[in-house]
Every structure is written in C-alpha cells, then in structure tokens.
Amino acid sequence: MYVVVAYDITEDEVRNKVADALKAYGLERIQRSVFVGRINPALLKDLVERLKRITKGANADITIFKVDRRAIDTAIRIGPPPPARKNVDLY
C-alpha cells in the first residue's frame, strides 16, 4: 500500500523527530510537511505507534492517507519536476 502523510507541528524538535521517523520507514518528502511512499500494513502500524510516542503532549496534527498505486500514478504535480525518488513516482 502507499501512504501520504501530512502534518502540522509547531515545535521544531517534535517536527524534526516526526520527519526523521517518516524517513526511517522509507517515506520520502515531497513537500515541507508531506511525505509519501510504499509501506506494508505491519510497518504502518509500527509507524503510527512511533508517531504517537513522538508527539505525545505536543501540539501536533498528523493525517495519514492510505492510497492505491493508481492514485500515485495519476497524481498531478504543478511546479518543477521533483528529484528522482526510489520509493514512489509522481508526475
């Protein structure tokens, strides 16, 4: 499955830890606070628990969208082309 993770976190330290966790699970940043990538259900469950621990008590809003490959393949991007990515293709 593919996921798109978007977040709004006011605290720099917490925001950086969330970004590091998303990268550690193989997701790639496509915007400042948006990550995308392929992840299996067991790892997604682990990631959700890790994000809950990281953001406990913080002013943090994280939304995880589960999307299928078709959604990734038909995404529309406006702006310069993104750098080559290993875990997802967006055009």
UniProtKB/Swiss-Prot annotation:
Binding locations of Mg(2+): D8
Transmembrane segments: none
GO terms classed as biological process: defense response to virus; maintenance of CRISPR repeat elements
Protein's UniProt keywords contain NADP: no
InterPro entries: CRISPR_associated_Cas2, Virulence_VapD/CRISPR_Cas2
Magnesium in keyword set: yes
Required co-factors: Mg(2+)
GO MF annotations, alphabetized: metal ion binding; RNA endonuclease activity
Domain of life: Archaea
Keywords: Antiviral defense, Endonuclease, Hydrolase, Magnesium, Metal-binding, Nuclease
EC numbers, comma separated: 3.1.-.-
Complex formation: Homodimer, forms a heterotetramer with a Cas1 homodimer.
PANTHER family named among the record's database cross-references: CRISPR-ASSOCIATED ENDORIBONUCLEASE CAS2 (PTHR34405), CRISPR-ASSOCIATED ENDORIBONUCLEASE CAS2 3 (PTHR34405:SF3)
Function noted in UniProt: CRISPR (clustered regularly interspaced short palindromic repeat), is an adaptive immune system that provides protection against mobile genetic elements (viruses, transposable elements and conjugative plasmids). CRISPR clusters contain sequences complementary to antecedent mobile elements and target invading nucleic acids. CRISPR clusters are transcribed and processed into CRISPR RNA (crRNA). Functions as a ssRNA-specific endoribonuclease. Involved in the integration of spacer DNA into the CRISPR cassette.
Family to which the UniProt record says this protein belongs: Belongs to the CRISPR-associated endoribonuclease Cas2 protein family.
Protein name: CRISPR-associated endoribonuclease Cas2 2
Gene source species: Pyrobaculum aerophilum (strain ATCC 51768 / DSM 7523 / JCM 9630 / CIP 104966 / NBRC 100827 / IM2)
Lineage of source species: Archaea, Thermoproteota, Thermoprotei, Thermoproteales, Thermoproteaceae
